[in-house]
């Protein structure tokens, strides 16, 4: 099979592309999907998420110290030791059995059924013990392909990605571009916080903006806050989960700014955080009680 693949010659028509977030959101950026609209026109911004609490302008006007910083993080792969692999056998009666290196059988069964057209009731998915996943194996790549090949050939089919194929074709976590602004009074109380987060989705929508915009301020009681997340498509592999998807991006930016605010106030960073720690049953930014 590998020798046969080497004989295939592919001719590509090279089109304009956008790799980085800044390239994808600029006014003259090449549009990946015409049906994706933002502000009434085709755009690479596939979705947004906004959280508000209090009066952000009033909060900053009350602050004695204000720190604003921008951050950029690159896409990072989960780096699991075992590559994606599966073994699929489709019997004469059309019932399929899938053994795969995955993080869940229900997802494998549902997605394989959706792609192949085989009813879920005719698919048995067996997740094997895996050599690491960290969120990167909560999606299927090989299972539907192996299922179709097994059905056509009448024989079991085994597929294993090479390390190069994993890095080229499977989903890493999002790269990001963020801006965070935090204000506090001289006594150490935070009066306002604002965060804007652009996350790479890859070629199709689905960046974990909820984790970045929704969780970045979760540990703290802040009377005036505003966060905004942008789901940005670009010419990259579709992203996948990676250990609390999106949350480290938001937390990293916020915590870095908190360190600078504490330094400007000449406070211990730990004491500064404890002073602003949210209490049980207080309302978080997402209008939910902290429990």
Annotate each predicted stretch with a short phrase.
Residues 1-291:
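Structural alpha/beta core scaffold segments of enzyme domains
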């Amino acid at each position: 099979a590998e020798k046969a693949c080497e004989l295939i010659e592919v001719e590509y028509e090279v089109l304009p592309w956008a790799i980085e977030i800044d390239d994808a959101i600029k006014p003259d950026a090449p549009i990946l999907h015409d049906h994706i609209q933002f502000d009434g026109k085709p755009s690479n911004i596939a979705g947004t998420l906004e959280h508000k609490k209090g009066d952000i302008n009033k909060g900053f006007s009350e602050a004695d110290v204000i720190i604003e910083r921008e951050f950029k993080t690159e896409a990072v792969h989960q780096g699991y030791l075992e590559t994606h692999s599966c073994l699929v056998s489709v019997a004469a009666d059309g019932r399929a059995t899938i053994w795969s290196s995955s993080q869940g059988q229900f997802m494998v069964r549902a997605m394989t059924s959706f792609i192949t057209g085989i009813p879920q009731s005719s698919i048995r998915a067996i997740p094997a013990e895996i050599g690491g996943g960290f969120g990167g194996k909560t999606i299927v790549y090989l299972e539907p392909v192996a299922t179709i090949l097994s059905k056509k050939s009448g024989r079991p089919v085994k597929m294993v990605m090479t390390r190069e194929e994993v890095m080229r074709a499977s989903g890493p976590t999002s790269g990001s571009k963020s801006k965070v602004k935090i204000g506090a009074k001289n006594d150490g109380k935070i009066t306002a916080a604002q965060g804007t987060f652009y996350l790479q989705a890859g070629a199709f929508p689905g960046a974990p903006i909820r984790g970045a915009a929704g969780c970045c301020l979760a540990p703290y009681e802040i009377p005036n806050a505003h966060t905004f997340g942008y789901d940005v498509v670009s010419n990259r592999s579709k992203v996948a989960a990676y250990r609390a998807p999106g949350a480290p991006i938001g937390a990293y930016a916020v915590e870095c700014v908190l360190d600078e605010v504490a330094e400007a106030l000449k406070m211990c960073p730990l004491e500064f955080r404890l002073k602003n720690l949210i209490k049980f049953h207080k309302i978080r930014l997402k209008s939910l009680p902290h429990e």
